[in-house]
């Protein structure tokens, strides 16, 4: 199990023009957890503090081949015109669902991105082709305000794409020789969840669970992403199973893992195939995400 505490994680400023000019903004970001697993799962999980004015993070209306989950720690975070995720609420962004344009200029939140077999491209082999892919794109077009503009080789006409999407297409072609395609959306739009409106049920003495939702973006009996909240009383334990990779986080102090008691804002990753257990020295509420399985 990997465990990260917010106050111990490095903060990096993504100043305007950074990230190879793909996204404007001045986000203060902490990379918390990530993996490229043997079963094809790729994810990254990070904490961001958004800033006002010229340092606001902006992006055009767009979509992705990967799935996302966003949770707001404090304030409220925008994801489209008139659309906000308030504190301690979350939104699930299904694969291929359009959202935005967004202006993130306030709030602190968590963002999880995940996909399989090139849907999500982070670290590993993708890191090795990123710089060259951006160089090629800049030779044939321009990045500005989160948009990549170039000339369509088939029609000869000017075209505009989300800058992140353009990079994914270029990287995927470089590694596989194939065209990167975002599938048709199965869900029409992001799904805003209000966890406080769900009720707990008692799963065991001292262990309560809220099931928030299961969402299928892939075929298969275990291909759903599962969202829940666990509440632990002193002396109770919650077990992460072997069959799925999972991440979890808590804003409460007192979470116990093995012989250590952790402070508030603790995050953990339990890879598929590993057993893990958490308990609490005092009552703790833990948000849990169970990753899909495609086999």
Residue ranges and their predicted role:
Residues 1-71, 76-295:
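Jelly-roll (double-stranded beta-helix
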């Amino acid at each position: 199990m990997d465990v990260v505490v917010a106050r111990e994680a490095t903060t990096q400023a993504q100043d305007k023009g950074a990230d190879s000019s793909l996204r404007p903004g001045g986000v203060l970001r902490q990379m918390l957890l990530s993996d490229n697993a043997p079963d094809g799962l790729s994810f990254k999980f990070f904490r961001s503090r958004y800033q006002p004015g010229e340092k606001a993070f902006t992006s055009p209306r767009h979509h992705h081949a990967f799935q996302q989950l966003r949770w707001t720690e404090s304030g409220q975070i925008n994801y489209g015109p008139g659309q906000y995720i308030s504190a301690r609420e979350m939104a699930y962004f299904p694969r291929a669902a359009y959202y935005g344009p967004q202006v993130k200029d306030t709030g602190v939140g968590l963002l999880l991105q995940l996909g399989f077999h090139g849907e999500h491209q982070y670290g590993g082999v993708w890191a090795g082709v990123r710089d060259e892919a951006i160089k090629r794109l800049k030779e044939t077009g321009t990045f500005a305000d989160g948009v990549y503009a170039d000339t369509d080789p088939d029609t000869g006409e000017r075209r505009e794409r989300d800058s992140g999407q353009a990079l994914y297409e270029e990287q995927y072609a470089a590694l596989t020789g194939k065209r990167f395609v975002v599938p048709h959306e199965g869900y029409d739009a992001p799904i805003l969840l209000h966890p406080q409106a769900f009720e707990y049920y008692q799963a065991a003495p001292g262990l309560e669970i809220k099931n928030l939702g299961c969402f299928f973006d892939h075929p298969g009996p275990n291909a759903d992403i599962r969202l829940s909240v666990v509440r632990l009383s002193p002396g109770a334990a919650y077990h992460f199973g072997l069959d799925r990779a999972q991440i979890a986080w808590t804003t409460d102090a007192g979470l116990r893992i093995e012989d250590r008691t952790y402070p508030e804002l603790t995050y953990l990753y339990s890879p598929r195939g590993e057993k893990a257990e958490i308990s609490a020295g005092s009552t703790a509420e833990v948000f849990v995400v169970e990753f899909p399985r495609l086999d």
